[in-house]
């Protein structure tokens, strides 16, 4: 029994010299570990004479409880001391204003700036217009008749003002430009547009950039060169590009522009629906009626136009699969790209 008292005294002596949690762990292992002193004492209980065994077992358990208590107290003491040292080293002056959170540009902003920079470098000017637009500029002057489905309330946001709506594209900026300027015209029109769409790849509000060139020499080959050059600079690689015949009321002939899938490199994936191609733009030669509506003499001038969705290009550029992520105001989403 005297041996048990000596073990307790030894433990107290060791604890008095412990100065770190690492040293404490070594003491804990020595006395309470699976091969520690107290564990060995419990293993030897069967060697104790039967008349002393009960008392021996009781004393060993009391020793174990006391050891656990002493070690726990020492641990709390060391943690408190460690915290005090840390606080001393990290003293904070509460009178100093907190550091400002540093923001970063939104992927849409980055994509839009990238598009504008490329076209400025190609000699295009930037024109802007109102988001609440006259129905005449949004539809009529663009050769979109009254019976066209795009004018239905299921697709367009009309406002409580006769003859006005939330623009469905930035094409009205082209109309406004042709009404106030004489050819030659070479502009892009970036901005927000609104349509009644709401699914993983569409949003009721999104960003568009449209381009317009009007002069004496504009032709389809010229337009094709401009678009191919833009896509090459935007994606920083010489992608396969194809033009598919399409229909738009304001252009004739019209085409859809596809690029080789940037995700699977035309091997076929879910994003390109296993076709190897991704639609990125629409384009065409400006319909003569649109030019005439703006007072431009079609005997001397012709033009071409094109348009693209900024979110669509941003999703391809950054590998984003849900358009709604752009509008959730989550800084973690924004910061992962920059």
Curated annotation (Swiss-Prot):
The record's gene field reads: pheS
A GO MF annotation of the entry reads: ATP binding
Q: How does it assemble?
A: Tetramer of two alpha and two beta subunits.
Q: Which organism is it from?
A: Aquifex aeolicus (strain VF5)
- So what EC number does this one have? 6.1.1.20
Protein name per Swiss-Prot or TrEMBL: Phenylalanine--tRNA ligase alpha subunit
Report the co-factor binding details: Binds 2 magnesium ions per tetramer.
Q: Does the keyword Nucleotide-binding apply?
A: yes
At which positions is Mg(2+) bound?
252
Alphabetical UniProt keywords: Aminoacyl-tRNA synthetase, ATP-binding, Cytoplasm, Ligase, Magnesium, Metal-binding, Nucleotide-binding, Protein biosynthesis
